[in-house]
UniProtKB/Swiss-Prot annotation:
It comes from Candida boidinii. GO terms for molecular function: ADP transmembrane transporter activity; AMP transmembrane transporter activity; ATP transmembrane transporter activity; coenzyme A transmembrane transporter activity; FAD transmembrane transporter activity; FMN transmembrane transporter activity; NAD transmembrane transporter activity. Pfam families: Mito_carr. Lacks a typical peroxisomal sorting signal. It is found in: Peroxisome membrane. Its main location: membrane. This is Peroxisomal membrane protein PMP47B. It comes from the Eukaryota. PANTHER family: PEROXISOMAL MEMBRANE PROTEIN PMP34, PEROXISOMAL MEMBRANE PROTEIN PMP34-RELATED. Residues 56-69 have a biased composition (Polar residues). GO terms for cellular component: peroxisomal membrane. Solcar repeats lie at residues 6-120, 142-230, 239-369. Residues 44-69, 274-305 are annotated as: Disordered. The chain crosses the membrane at residues 12-32, 98-118, 204-224, 245-265, 310-330, 349-369.
Length: 419
């Protein structure tokens, strides 16, 4: 990183551009991981269809719209072969358009609020930096707590804002071939389709594990910031794009290992919201909540467990998204074991590390170009000497309106002069 000061929007646009490039390069790995995380549900559907076919002969396994991967443990290579056989190489890029749209918006929002929050915290911890200039140089990095706070704010805002995009992406990636109409839509059309046919709540399916996943960038960027500070202190130089590549990859490795179970849960919830109707979901919720403390056994076990009734009452009062996440996680543990939470981890680690490495590298390379464009735009619009915020934009529009409407010129100009 250079010692020059970069605008918050420069970081936002550079992050969005870096995300687009890195996602494009690693998207086939994203597809494999998503298939691995959600494959069990598709396998279960196929097994049921095979049983029905064997009983009455009314259904042929070959006529099923669901995946017909064998019942044995599925490797990543088998998933790859299945995708290539059924859909060709383009199957590895199902949902790419929505993923690019999602990562661009996510990174733009994240980096903007990360830089904005980080600089705000730095000004408050170092009041002397606010005298004479509003800019704060972050080349030595944020403290641990500042990194975590900035990551929490930026992560929460970006997750909530982009969750509908990722719901659409998961469905387009997994079900684009089987779902017909949904697979032919672009991201905005898919979101509108879900909104009209299933309601706005479905667009925020998986928001609870998504908010838990705010821990992922917090961990990643905290590690990145601290290692960046270490390099600046020890080597007496700024961080280069290659340094950023290595530090970003290492931070993502640690963050992904810690938060991967929530990534799997989120993918399961995105698929579950479409494959099961509301009545089945409500019935499953009631049955599962009653069976959780009993560990799947008979009623006598509830008497042996003095906390069963209390746990049931607590769970019944929790918000529906939290209960749904808890039930899905419990069923995965009971039916598939702990390993189900880490299915596809190897490919995900490879994808995440490469994606983070490319992201940090491209972001550093694009930062100078992005900053030059932003500052040129500011000079043209008259905002070069001020931070780019809502107040400046409003004043710019006021000035423009005054130029077009002479009657309002005498009322608005004095207001700006007073400030």
């Amino acid at each position: 990183m250079s010692s020059r000061e970069y605008d918050d929007l420069s970081h936002a646009f550079a992050g969005a551009g870096g995300g687009l490039l890195s996602m494009t390069l690693t998207y086939p790995l994203v597809t494999l991981t998503t298939h691995a995380q959600t494959m069990v549900r598709l396998k279960k559907n196929e097994e049921e269809e095979k049983e029905n076919s064997n009983e009455d002969g009314s259904l042929s396994p070959k006529s099923s719209n669901t995946s017909n991967i064998s019942q044995k443990k599925i490797s990543q290579f088998e998933i790859l072969k299945k995708i290539l056989k059924d859909q060709g190489a383009k199957g590895l890029y199902n949902g790419l358009e929505s993923a690019l749209f999602g990562i661009a918006v996510t990174n733009f929002v994240y980096y903007y609020f990360y830089e904005l929050t980080g600089k705000t915290l730095s000004r408050r911890s170092n009041p002397q930096t606010t005298s004479g200039s509003k800019k704060v140089t972050l080349k030595k990095g944020l403290s641990v707590w500042q990194s975590m706070a900035a990551g929490a704010v930026a992560g929460t805002i970006s997750r909530v804002a982009t969750n509908p995009i990722w719901v659409a992406n998961t469905r387009m990636t997994i079900l684009s071939k089987n779902q017909g109409k949904l697979g032919k839509l672009n991201t905005i059309e898919a979101i509108i389709y879900i909104l009209k046919n299933e309601g706005w709540q479905k667009l925020f399916t998986g928001i609870v594990p998504a908010l838990f996943l705010v821990l992922n960038p917090i961990i990643q960027y905290t590690i990145f910031e601290q290692l960046k500070s270490f390099i600046v202190k020890i080597k007496k130089r700024n961080v280069t794009p290659v340094d950023a590549l290595l530090l970003g990859a290492f931070g993502k490795l640690i963050a992904t290992i810690i938060t991967y179970p929530y990534i799997t849960l989120r993918s399961r919830m995105h698929v579950k919201s479409m494959t099961e109707n509301n009545e089945d979901s409500e019935k499953e919720r009631t049955d599962s909540v009653q069976s959780l403390p009993e560990d799947g056994s008979d009623e006598d076990n509830s008497k042996e467990n003095p906390y069963a009734e209390t746990i049931n009452k607590i769970i019944s009062k929790l918000p529906s998204p939290i209960v749904s996440m808890f039930i899905i996680g419990y069923k995965m543990y009971k039916e598939e074991g702990v390993s189900s939470f880490y299915r596809g981890l190897s490919v995900k680690l490879l994808q995440s590390i490469l994606n983070a490495a490319f992201l940090f590298y491209f972001k550093e390379e694009l930062l100078i170009l992005s900053d030059a464009i932003i500052k040129s735009t500011k000079r043209v619009t008259g905002l070069a000497n001020n931070p780019y915020n809502a107040k400046d934009v409003i004043h710019s529009f006021e000035k423009a309106l005054c130029m077009r409407n002479p009657r309002s010129r005498t009322t608005t100009v004095p207001q700006t002069n007073e400030e």
